[in-house]
Amino acid sequence: MPVITLPDGSQRSFSNPVTVMQVAEDIGPGLAKATVAGRIDGQLVDACELISDDAKLSIITGKDPEGVEIIRHSFAHLVGHAVKQLYPTAQMAIGPVIDEGFYYDIAYERPFTPDDLAAIEKRIAELVKTDYDVVKRMTPIAEARQQFVDRGESYKVALIDDMDESTKEVGLYYHEEYMDMCRGPHVPNTRVLRHFKLMKLAGAYWRGDSNNEMLQRIYGTAWNDKKELKGYLTRIEEAEKRDHRKLGKKLDLFHVQEEAPGMVFWHPKGWRLYQAVEQYMRQKQLDNNYQEVKTPQIVDRVLWEKSGHWGKYHENMFTTHSENRDYAVKPMNCPCHIQVYNQGLKSYRDLPFRMAEFGSCHRNEPSGALHGIMRVRNFVQDDGHIFVTEGQIQQEVSEFIDLLHEVYADFGFDNIVYRLSTRPEQRVGSDEVWDKAEKALSEALDSAGLDWEELPGEGAFYGPKIEFSLKDAIGRVWQCGTIQVDFSMPTRLGAQYVSEDGSRQTPVMLHRAIVGSLERFIGILIEDTEGAFPVWLAPEQVVIMNITDRQADYCSVLEKRLNSNGFRAKLDLRNEKIGFKIREHTLQRVPYMIVVGDKEVEQEQVAVRTRTGEDLGVMSISDFEGLLQQEIARRSRKQEVEIVL
């Protein structure tokens, strides 16, 4: 007679074994109707799971995060159900849940079209309205394999053949005539599957291997209620408006092309933006006692073998061969920085030893993973490495966090997510050293008064790390900064220092970055600001426009003066109406526009307006320069103009 303990501590006794759904029905019909799955003694199970012994039970509904994931997974099966009805010869591969949605990879004799996607979505909507039961059957693996063979589902057969020999049975889920394989859980009935949208079509290699056949991927999203779905679709629409690839073209910042996949062609305006970010970071590092270095792009494989990268990372490295030697284009800077550190024996008095480089790295990312300037093969990092003693870790991490906050604030980011990743099962170094490092990182976060999340087991094999992620204007989270403790590489590459007692010791190395990839960070800035950069970052801070040719010479004098004084000014003397020019430069997000007519020439003044349409009136060029300087010094995203004449 099982006794079921519910989350509120109440108990219910049953005379016979019961399913999760039967417990929900015993509590009330409303809960039963909303039930998606259950959690028995901490383990997620299907609603049909039988409970024979005393247990703790939570009923999972669509209001629970796990419930939403189950709804999404079940919608992936519905994609399979609909596709097989509409395109019987299609073969289903895999259909997992992803962040805020799901996808299904499918093999079919021709490419799916947008019309096909609409037809599949329509069929899914028809299927869910029938409120059919989803039936789970645990099936011996040989029998399940034969069923997929009989149905011509070669990808499912391949998945079964890859299973561990200890696997005796698999879960088969039946959506009426459609059958799919999954460990589950899945919804008990399609009545809880209502709010969804198929989003797009894409290509994907089977098993993610470019040597395998290309499949077709159908992406979708699903939510517990209509409001959540609408909110998501609104966020997606807003994200598309802010897409850095579209804005990069519209604002003439950069482009990428097939002849150099994953590598950026920076245009003049984009390169000015890039340089503004780099020069700002360079000055910040100099102000915080980092020594900037420059290390080679191509290094003999011997160094990469010593560092461990050749064995663990070789497939992602670009390599070359010359004069019977193998080389790799560096995918990261750390081994080279240790070579700089090793030039001349260091004393404990030299530590902490802070080194920085705007290092150009190349990584052979899969072509399908490339995305504008957010995911590239060639990128530059604000890379830094700090060599410390074990006792210096916490202080250095605390100072790094302070610096990171200054930088993010200047770029307009104040919503930061902090995650501490701790020791994995496979690691180097003693537990005692890991204890010290993890304690140092956590205390640095605590001393800064930060709320942070621990990710057990997610640290690198060589040490724990803190990751810093930014939330942008529409709530998306971007991982940017990091600081990682490394016990391994200094030992592998022979880094040492002379301790206070005269003995040779190995320093701990802290890998750190604040913006990370400059390309990716600029992509984030573009999307977060929608291209309306704060004045200090704007590629063009002011544009000077004449009304007629009579003002051309005066405009040229103004442009030369502003550029000579360190501002980024542009001259527009085109024979166009002034309203047309203003509109064009407003769309180009230029912060300030100077309009010059005969009156301004006569009085040696300028008429100023902002990209938001605010008319600031007429002022001297000196006053305008003061206004610009004030905006640049404040580094605020908001144009708050205070004019003192």
Curated annotation (Swiss-Prot):
Source organism superkingdom: Bacteria
UniProt keywords, alphabetically: Aminoacyl-tRNA synthetase, ATP-binding, Cytoplasm, Ligase, Metal-binding, Nucleotide-binding, Protein biosynthesis, RNA-binding, tRNA-binding, Zinc
Annotated region (Catalytic), positions in chain: 243-534
Keyword Ribonucleoprotein on entry: no
Binding, Zn(2+): 334, 385, 511
SMART domains (alphabetical): tRNA_SAD
Xref: InterPro entries: aa-tRNA-synt_IIb (IPR002314), aa-tRNA-synth_II (IPR006195), aa-tRNA-synth_II/BPL/LPL (IPR045864), Anticodon-bd (IPR004154), Anticodon-bd_dom_sf (IPR036621), Beta-grasp_dom_sf (IPR012675), TGS (IPR004095), TGS-like (IPR012676)
Residue ranges of domain TGS in the record: 1-61
Catalytic activity: tRNA(Thr) + L-threonine + ATP = L-threonyl-tRNA(Thr) + AMP + diphosphate + H(+)
Biological-process GO terms, alphabetical: threonyl-tRNA aminoacylation
Enzyme Commission numbers on file: 6.1.1.3
Family according to the record: Belongs to the class-II aminoacyl-tRNA synthetase family.
Protein purpose: Catalyzes the attachment of threonine to tRNA(Thr) in a two-step reaction: L-threonine is first activated by ATP to form Thr-AMP and then transferred to the acceptor end of tRNA(Thr). Also edits incorrectly charged L-seryl-tRNA(Thr).
NCBIfam families listed in its UniProt record: thrS (TIGR00418)
Protein name (Swiss-Prot/TrEMBL): Threonine--tRNA ligase
Organism: Marinomonas sp. (strain MWYL1)
The organism's taxonomic lineage, starting at the top: Bacteria, Pseudomonadati, Pseudomonadota, Gammaproteobacteria, Oceanospirillales
Gene: thrS
